[in-house]
């Protein structure tokens, strides 16, 4: 259970902190982390074809083969393959972790993820925006302030019903402690009470992350199989 809890924290897509002020505390802690600063951009980039293949591994082939694929460039994510089924697959980097996570700047982080249409319209813009800010050299405090303001002003949309994603890749490296963790699904909801769905209760298989200031709740459900059909062991 402890391993799952640690891993769940490591893979939460785009979790910031509950209040803006904690960003400054996080920056003060950076000096004690294994990755106190952003590495050279080259360490986060991948071979284009390898990144496309890794992105597709996030979901079963029946979904990912016709999905739009985005890859990371020097200024943000770029469309590498146009899709036919409204899904969007990509490989997130370590800065999608909580902003005070010790591995926030870990250049080894690779999180293959595939969003359905609802998540692509409403959750993906947050990932894109945060990545652009990071690659433009913004500080953690500036990133939090910009994203929080955009959410409050509705420049970044609220979650649509049914917004979710697949994270079923064996190829992922979510953190130094979790590795590829376990195959799982995530569901994005605009501010919900986690316990209303039983998340976090004793014996419940559902994890939840509640970001009050971001007006976002993420539910995480581990599943038994990887995208290639093999069983998680």
Predicted segments with their positions:
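Bacterial N-terminal signal peptides that target proteins for export
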Residues: 2-14
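Primary mode marks residue(s) on the alpha4-beta5-alpha5 output face of response regulator receiver
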Residues: 30-233
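Hydrophobic alpha-helical membrane-embedded or membrane-associated segments
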Residues: 16-20
């Amino acid at each position: 259970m402890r391993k799952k809890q640690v891993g769940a924290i490591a893979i939460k897509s785009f979790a910031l902190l509950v209040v803006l002020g904690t960003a400054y505390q996080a920056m003060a802690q950076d000096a004690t982390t294994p990755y106190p600063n952003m590495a050279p951009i080259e360490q986060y980039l991948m071979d284009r074809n390898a990144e496309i293949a890794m992105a597709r591994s996030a979901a079963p082939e029946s979904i990912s083969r016709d999905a739009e694929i985005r890859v990371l460039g020097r200024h943000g994510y770029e469309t590498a393959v146009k899709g036919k089924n409204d899904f969007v697959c990509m490989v997130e980097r370590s800065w999608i972790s909580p902003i005070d996570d010790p591995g926030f700047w870990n250049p080894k982080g690779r999180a293959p993820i595939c969003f359905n249409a609802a998540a692509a319209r409403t959750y993906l813009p947050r990932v894109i925006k945060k990545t652009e800010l990071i690659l433009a050299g913004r500080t953690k405090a500036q990133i939090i302030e910009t994203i929080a303001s955009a959410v409050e002003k509705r420049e970044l949309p609220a979650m649509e019903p049914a917004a979710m994603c697949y994270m079923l890749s064996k190829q992922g490296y979510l953190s130094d402690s979790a590795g590829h963790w376990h195959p799982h699904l995530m569901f994005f909801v605009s501010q919900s009470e986690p316990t209303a769905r039983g998340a976090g209760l004793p014996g419940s298989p559902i994890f939840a992350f509640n970001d009050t200031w971001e007006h976002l709740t993420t539910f995480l459900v581990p599943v038994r199989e990887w995208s290639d059909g093999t069983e998680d062991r």
